[in-house]
C-alpha cells in the first residue's frame, strides 16, 4: 500500500471555494490562503447565529499504544462515510504541532485514505496560527523582562515567574535556561525555560475564546508571576493584552480545508491532551455546528484525558454537549493492556484481548456515566484475526453497547459506512447529559471525582507544594474553575506502566497551576514534560523536499 503522503499527493484536491459552497459559504465569506486553504471570519458565525446547531459526535479512544490508535483517521473516515450517505457533515480537528511531526509522529492529519488535505501544509506551517501563538507567548515574556529591567514597577519577584517562553519544536536543551546575562544592559539575570508552543496557555486561551473581546479578557487574566508580597501578577497588569490580542487576530479565525473525499473540515488549534485540554477550538466547533447537520470532532489521547476534558471543560464554553460518543479501540492496544509485549502485538492472542478488554470497558462506563450513548469503533489492522475481532465484538455487545468494524484507513469513507449507519440511529435520541462535577464544588472534590470515578483510583495525595498552591487558589477566588489533569496518556493512573484497568491506586498531584486565562486549574500528576525531547532517530531523518518542491517522508 502507498504511504500516507503518496496517497495524499495522488488525491484530487478541490479548490477551497468549492468546499465552501458545500456548507453554504460564498467567496465573500472566506479569506483565501492559496487555492486549498481558507479562514472563516468571525462575522460568518454571527451571520448564521440563528441557525439551529447540528448533531455533535465526539470521537475518543482507549488508552493508546505509543503509535496511537487511529482516532483522527476514524474521525475523518466517519465524516466521509456520512457524506457518502448524502448527509450535510463536517469534521472539526486539532492542527498538528511541528515538534511531534518531526520527532515521532511524522504527521497527524489522519492516515491512509482517511486524511485531510493539503496534508503537507497542515502538518508543517499551515496558516501560521501556531507561529502566531509562539510570537504572542514570547512577546509576553519580552514585556515581562522589560518591566523587570525598567525598574520593576509591578514589584515582580524574579524567583516566582511562572511564564515560560515557547517553541514549536521538541528541544530538551531549552527546558531550563538562564537569561539576562552579559551585564546591566542585557536585562535582569534569572532562570527561565521553554515549553512546546501547544502547551502554552495562549493556545488554550485561543481554543476556548468565543470572540476578540473574550480573547482580550482571557489574555488579561493570565497569571505570569507573583510579586514580593506573593500576590498574582497578570498580563493585564503589564497592560499588553490588547497588543497580544492584535497578534492573534487572524489566528482566532477557524481554518477550512477538506478530506480526501472532499468533505469540509475545520482544523483549528492544537493543545496537547496530556498537558492542556486537548480539544480543537470552540469557535471552529461552533462554526461547524451552524454550517452542518452533523459534526464529527475528536479529543486527544484516551477518554480519560481528552474525552473527560472535552466534557468537563470544553462543553461549558461551547454551550453544547455531544449527542453520541465513539470510542476507538484497536486489538493491538487491547493486547498491550492484556500484558503482551510491544514486539508481539501483531501475533494472535485472544486471551490477551479478553484481559485487556477491562481498559475499554472502563472507558465505556465512564462515557456512559455522563449520560451519553456510546458506540465502539474497532479500527482494523492487517494483523487482526477473525477470532480476536469476534471476541472483542462479543465482549462489547455483552455490555449492551454497539460495535462497528471500521476499515477507513484502507477504504476511506466506504470503510466507515456501518459505523455511520449505527450512529445515525443513535443520534435520533436526546442524551440526558450530566457533568462529573459542579463548578462550585471545592477543588479537592473535583480532583477526587476525576481520580476515583474516571481513573478508578482510591485516593488523591497532594505534595507540600500542591497543598500550598491549593490554599493560594482558594485565597484568590479561583476555586470555581474546572480541573485539567496533566498525566501520562498510557494508563488510567499517573504511572505509564499500570495498564488495563488498575484499581485501588493512589495518585500524587505534584503541582496545581492556575491557568486563569484559559479558565482551568492544571493538576500535574507524575512526570509530565511540557517540552518534549527528540528520539534517537527522529522522523525528520526520513523527510526531504525535491528540487521541484515535492515533499517526502511525512506519514
Swiss-Prot record:
- Record-level Gene Ontology MF annotations: ATP binding; formate-tetrahydrofolate ligase activity
Reactions it catalyzes: (6S)-5,6,7,8-tetrahydrofolate + formate + ATP = (6R)-10-formyltetrahydrofolate + ADP + phosphate
Binding sites annotated in the UniProt record for ATP:
65-72
The EC class name is: ligase
Q: Which Gene3D superfamilies match?
A: Domain 2, N(10)-formyltetrahydrofolate synthetase (3.30.1510.10), Formyltetrahydrofolate synthetase, domain 3 (3.10.410.10), P-loop containing nucleotide triphosphate hydrolases (3.40.50.300)
Q: Which Pfam families match?
A: FTHFS
Which keywords does the record carry?
ATP-binding, Ligase, Nucleotide-binding, One-carbon metabolism
Q: Which InterPro entries match?
A: Formate_THF_ligase, Formate_THF_ligase_CS, P-loop_NTPase
- Family matches, as SUPFAM superfamilies: P-loop containing nucleoside triphosphate hydrolases
* EC numbers, comma separated: 6.3.4.3
Query: Which BP terms from GO are recorded?
Result: tetrahydrofolate interconversion
Pathway where this protein functions: One-carbon metabolism; tetrahydrofolate interconversion
Q: Which HAMAP family match?
A: FTHFS
**Family indicated by similarity:** Belongs to the formate--tetrahydrofolate ligase family.
Name of protein = Formate--tetrahydrofolate ligase
Amino acid at each position: 500500500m502507498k504511504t500516507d503522503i503518496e496517497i495524499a499527493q495522488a488525491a484530487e484536491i478541490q479548490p477551497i471555494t468549492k468546499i465552501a459552497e458545500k456548507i453554504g459559504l460564498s467567496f465573500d465569506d472566506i479569506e483565501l490562503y492559496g487555492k486549498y486553504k481558507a479562514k472563516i471570519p468571525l462575522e460568518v458565525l454571527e451571520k448564521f447565529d440563528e441557525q439551529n446547531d447540528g448533531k455533535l459526535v465526539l470521537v475518543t479512544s482507549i488508552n493508546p499504544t505509543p503509535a496511537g490508535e487511529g482516532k483522527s483517521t476514524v474521525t475523518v473516515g466517519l465524516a466521509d462515510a456520512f457524506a457518502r450517505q448524502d448527509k450535510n457533515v463536517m469534521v472539526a480537528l486539532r492542527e498538528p504541532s511541528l515538534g511531534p511531526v518531526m520527532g515521532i509522529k511524522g504527521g497527524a492529519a489522519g492516515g491512509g485514505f482517511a486524511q485531510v488535505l493539503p496534508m503537507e501544509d497542515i502538518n508543517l506551517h499551515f496558516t501560521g496560527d501556531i507561529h502566531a501563538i509562539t510570537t504572542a507567548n514570547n512577546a509576553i515574556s519580552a514585556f515581562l523582562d522589560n518591566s523587570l529591567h525598567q525598574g520593576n514597577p509591578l514589584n515582580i519577584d524574579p524567583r516566582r515567574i511562572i511564564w515560560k517562553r515557547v517553541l514549536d519544536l521538541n528541544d530538551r536543551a531549552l527546558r531550563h535556561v538562564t537569561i539576562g546575562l552579559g551585564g546591566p544592559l542585557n536585562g535582569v539575570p534569572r532562570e527561565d525555560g521553554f515549553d512546546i508552543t501547544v502547551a502554552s496557555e495562549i493556545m488554550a486561551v485561543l481554543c476556548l475564546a468565543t470572540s476578540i473581546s473574550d480573547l482580550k479578557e482571557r489574555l488579561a487574566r493570565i497569571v505570569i508571576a507573583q510579586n514580593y508580597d506573593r500576590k498574582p501578577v497578570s498580563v493585564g497588569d503589564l497592560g499588553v493584552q490588547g497588543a497580544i490580542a492584535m497578534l492573534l487576530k487572524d489566528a482566532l479565525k477557524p481554518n477550512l480545508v477538506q478530506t480526501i473525499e472532499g468533505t469540509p473540515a475545520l482544523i483549528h488549534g492544537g493543545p496537547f491532551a496530556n498537558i492542556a485540554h486537548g480539544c480543537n477550538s470552540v469557535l471552529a466547533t461552533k462554526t461547524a455546528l451552524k454550517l452542518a447537520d452533523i459534526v464529527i470532532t475528536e479529543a486527544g489521547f484516551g477518554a480519560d484525558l481528552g474525552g473527560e476534558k472535552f466534557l468537563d471543560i470544553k462543553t461549558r464554553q461551547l454551550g453544547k454537549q455531544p449527542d453520541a460518543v465513539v470510542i476507538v479501540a484497536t486489538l493491538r492496544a487491547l493486547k498491550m493492556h492484556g500484558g503482551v509485549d510491544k514486539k508481539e502485538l501483531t501475533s494472535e492472542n485472544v486471551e490477551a484481548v479478553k484481559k485487556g478488554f477491562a481498559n475499554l470497558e472502563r472507558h465505556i462506563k465512564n462515557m456512559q456515566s455522563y449520560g451519553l450513548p456510546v458506540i465502539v469503533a474497532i479500527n482494523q489492522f492487517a494483523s487482526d484475526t477473525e477470532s480476536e475481532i469476534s471476541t472483542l465484538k462479543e465482549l462489547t455487545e455483552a455490555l449492551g453497547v454497539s460495535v462497528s468494524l471500521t476499515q477507513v484507513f484502507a477504504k476511506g469513507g466506504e470503510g466507515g459506512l456501518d459505523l455511520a449507519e449505527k450512529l445515525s440511529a443513535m443520534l435520533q435520541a436526546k442524551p440526558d447529559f450530566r457533568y462529573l462535577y459542579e463548578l462550585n464544588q471545592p477543588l479537592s472534590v473535583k480532583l477526587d471525582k476525576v481520580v476515583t470515578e474516571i481513573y478508578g483510583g482510591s485516593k488523591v495525595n497532594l505534595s507540600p507544594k500542591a497543598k500550598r498552591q491549593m490554599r493560594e487558589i482558594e485565597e484568590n477566588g479561583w476555586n470555581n474553575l474546572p480541573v485539567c489533569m496533566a498525566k501520562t496518556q498510557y494508563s488510567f493512573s499517573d504511572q505509564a506502566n499500570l495498564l488495563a484497568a488498575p484499581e485501588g491506586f493512589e495518585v500524587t498531584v505534584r503541582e496545581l497551576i492556575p491557568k486563569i486565562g484559559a479558565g482551568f486549574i492544571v493538576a500535574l500528576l507524575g512526570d509530565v514534560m511540557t517540552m518534549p525531547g527528540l528520539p534517537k532517530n527522529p522522523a525528520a531523518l526520513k523527510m526531504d523536499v525535491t528540487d521541484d518542491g515535492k515533499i517526502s517522508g511525512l506519514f
